[in-house]
């Protein structure tokens, strides 16, 4: 089972009816909190009892100056979480918030990343290699789009 965590205090998760739930399902996973409608808060006890195999956290929602994600740090260092399968197996992953927390064309990138995390044997990649450590500013695609549009406009003028 897989859980997408938006925040850790309180534990805010993506449930049924969210595009994160759809990404998890399309990647071959089962949302550990599929019984929760939309986004919701679950107690620490509920989270521990659910015992997910994978924990996905969004980057950028809690980055330290050193580039660490405080949500991921919470799950890895919280003593009460040490019995959770995802923590025991080091399956707590940071995913770029620009691809997992915003519905749009880049959701395909989230699907690819989640599928790689859940099925590294199929995709031939080490899931920990796909985990970003820096916060994405979200402006990386502007320059190529402008260049493409300029090329199209110049082509039309001829």
For each of these PLM feature ranges, what is it?
Residues 1-108, 112, 122-125:
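Binding-cleft/active-site segments that stabilize strongly anionic ligands or cofactors
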Residues 46, 114, 156-158:
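A generic membrane alpha-helix/interface feature
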Residues 116-120:
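Internal hydrophobic alpha-helix adjacent to the cofactor/substrate pocket in enzyme cavities
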Residues 126-158:
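Secretory targeting signatures
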């Amino acid at each position: 089972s897989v859980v997408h965590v938006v925040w850790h205090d309180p534990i805010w998760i993506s449930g049924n009816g969210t595009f994160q739930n759809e990404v998890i399902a399309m990647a071959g996973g089962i949302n550990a909190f599929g019984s929760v409608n939309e986004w919701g808060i679950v107690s620490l006890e509920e989270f521990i009892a659910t015992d997910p195999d994978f924990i996905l956290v969004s980057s950028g929602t809690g980055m330290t100056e050193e580039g660490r994600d405080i949500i991921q740090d919470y799950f890895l260092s919280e003593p009460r979480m040490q019995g959770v399968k995802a923590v025991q197996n080091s399956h707590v992953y940071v995913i770029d918030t620009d691809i997992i927390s915003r519905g749009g064309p880049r959701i395909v990138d989230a699907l690819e990343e989640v599928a790689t995390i859940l099925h590294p044997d199929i995709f031939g990649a080490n899931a920990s290699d796909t985990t970003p450590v820096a916060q994405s500013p979200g402006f990386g695609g502007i320059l190529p789009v402008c260049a493409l549009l300029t090329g199209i406009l110049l082509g039309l003028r001829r």
